[in-house]
């Protein structure tokens, strides 16, 4: 691992993936990427990990695809025991490193916490999570405490134009054409 100056916590941390189990005896690790294209995780450097409450830079020496997995070699990690200490560490970057999006594309992190309102003005609740279903993304919306339909959570497809009519990130409001009883 890099022996640079002590890194500070990222201003706007975003998790891009996670280090998995060790691979072989020479310090390689599996990587689980959360980026849309798995290999895109390597476009964002430097990586930060948090161990024992301290942030550390991770400098990649090499990476490659092995079967269905991505595996990495971290600089300064040369054996299985050292690599094992990195297992399950989340790979974090500052969200300022992410490229700007165009049109109707949004980073999931920007949708979290937005209030979802129907086109008729009914407040469905707040976005607490996003799911990828294959055909489209789905918002997990936590219903308000006094929901008239007795709902605790709703799954609302994030289909721009069909279901999602307007996204206002400044006001933190998403307008959806969705039946509150569903």
UniProtKB/Swiss-Prot annotation:
Cellular component GO terms held in the UniProt record: cytoplasm; ribosome
Signal peptide: none
SUPFAM superfamilies: PRC-barrel domain (SSF50346), Translation proteins (SSF50447)
Alphabetized Pfam families for the sequence: PRC_RimM (PF24986), RimM (PF01782)
Subcellular location(s) of the protein: Cytoplasm
Major place of residence: cytoplasm
Keyword Acyltransferase carried by entry: no
Keywords recorded for this protein, A-Z: Chaperone, Cytoplasm, Ribosome biogenesis, rRNA processing
GO biological process, one term: ribosomal small subunit biogenesis
Domain PRC barrel: 103-182
One MF term in the entry's GO annotations: ribosome binding
Subunit structure: Binds ribosomal protein uS19.
Role, per record: An accessory protein needed during the final step in the assembly of 30S ribosomal subunit, possibly for assembly of the head region. Essential for efficient processing of 16S rRNA. May be needed both before and after RbfA during the maturation of 16S rRNA. It has affinity for free ribosomal 30S subunits but not for 70S ribosomes.
PANTHER family cross-referenced by the UniProt entry: RIBOSOME MATURATION FACTOR RIMM (PTHR33692:SF1)
Domain free text: The PRC barrel domain binds ribosomal protein uS19.
Protein family per UniProt: Belongs to the RimM family.
Record's protein name: Ribosome maturation factor RimM
The species this protein was found in: Serratia proteamaculans (strain 568)
